[in-house]
């Protein structure tokens, strides 16, 4: 009885640990060839590739752990593998983030958005959690809560496509101070752009394709999400992701 209880609790503990990682990675796996296709010469260096590879490894480990035939020794081995993988990933990501500290990312403001930006955004590689790029903006005319909620920070790749269009409440970053109802021309705004999927603890993306997009990060654009330009980027990204899901399903089905 004690042995059965131990086995049950041991399995539950390992599942919980992997589950925490899979909350970030999400379901599904990408092939090794997909990971090898991810470029490492962009603004974010090898972090997107390392993230995608980590996701693959965690998903593979999960599949092994959920095998119908899993002995007590295999449970312990799987947990040890996961612990080692997690620590190795932390070290790799920490080194990669530190190497990016201070690196500049261009930022633009869409015509019609009442703001200007001073210089570029700079990566803060010394923070825990999300990797951020920080900069300073300025109102060019009065701001209200009504139009503030329309403005989003969109990461754009080298081909002019959106990498993501919605995250964290609709923003891929924050415009601190823009929410003030009495925003005045000349008032300073702190701009914080989030780089998704490359945290110290590893991946927050479930697909190598997501990391392929981040690997091609070229700039951020502050946009009005009610404009046709934003809506076009959003629809294009949705179509691209839908096609990727169909391609993955065909691959699993052997087509």
List each model region and its residues.
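Short amphipathic alpha-helical heptad-repeat segments
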Residues: 47-60
């Amino acid at each position: 009885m004690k042995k059965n209880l131990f086995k049950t609790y041991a399995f539950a503990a390992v599942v919980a640990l992997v589950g925490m990682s899979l909350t970030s990675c999400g379901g599904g796996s990408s092939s090794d060839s997909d990971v090898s296709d991810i470029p490492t010469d962009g603004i974010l260096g090898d972090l997107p590739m390392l993230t995608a590879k980590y996701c693959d490894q965690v998903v593979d480990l999960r599949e092994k752990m959920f095998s119908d035939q899993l002995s007590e020794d295999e449970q312990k081995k799987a947990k040890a593998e996961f612990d080692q993988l997690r620590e190795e990933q932390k070290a790799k990501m920490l080194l990669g983030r530190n190497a990016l500290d201070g690196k500049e990312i261009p930022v633009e403001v869409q015509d019609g958005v009442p703001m200007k930006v001073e210089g570029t955004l700079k990566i803060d590689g010394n923070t825990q959690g999300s990797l951020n790029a920080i900069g300073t903006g300025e109102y060019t005319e009065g701001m209200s809560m009504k139009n503030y909620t329309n403005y989003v920070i969109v990461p754009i790749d080298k081909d002019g496509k959106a990498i993501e269009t919605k995250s964290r409440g609709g923003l891929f970053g924050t415009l601190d101070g823009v929410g003030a109802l009495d925003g005045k021309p000349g008032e300073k705004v702190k701009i914080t752009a989030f780089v998704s999927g490359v945290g110290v603890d590893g991946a927050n993306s479930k697909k190598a394709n997501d990391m392929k997009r981040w690997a091609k990060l070229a700039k951020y654009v502050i946009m009005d999400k009610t404009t046709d330009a934003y809506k076009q980027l959003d629809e294009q990204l949705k179509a691209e992701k839908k096609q990727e899901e169909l391609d993955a399903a065909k691959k699993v089905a052997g087509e």
